[in-house]
Amino acid sequence: MLLRVNPAAVVAVTAVVVTVAGCSTTVSGSAHRAHPAVPDPHRSYGYVDDRCGLLLDGSIREAVGADHIARPYSGAVCQYMLSRGPDGDAEAPPTTIDITFSWFETGSFDRERALAAERGAVVTDTVVERHEAFLARRDTTGAACSATAAAGTGVLSWWVQFRGQPGGDPCEDAEMLLSATLRSDL
């Protein structure tokens, strides 16, 4: 007795065998998290229209709860000096806050992260407004922290220091300013 085999069935069985054999390959190594491209590869964060990091001086003052703000320098790097009154203690002196914004148009996120670690900062990876970012806490002459993100064609940072004050959380203010910059629309 002869068995009749359908040619379509032979092709189907052969395709399944080839597919299973091809999909059973073992790959060595370890998994690494994908690094997505920045969400805004062509956006500029430079100094324009008397704004640093796309933010007006008044919005920076409000964001950190300061009473006064002065910007002694503007350009690729913008420097601010702010003062914030004491919280509930009329006898305490006001807190002086130093803030620096920088945007390096062709900067490298990995380079900035390596430099922060090399200089002794405690580096914490995070994501801010869909951008790969890190916080770098380094208290030398007061509580200080920078929030840095890959953005546009480069990297931008907000650095906040509570001058002469060992306590407080400058990372909260730095991350808030970074978030405001990344959300800003011109």
Briefly describe each language-model feature range.
Residues 31, 58-64, 84-93, 153-154, ...:
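Extracellular/mature segments of secreted proteins
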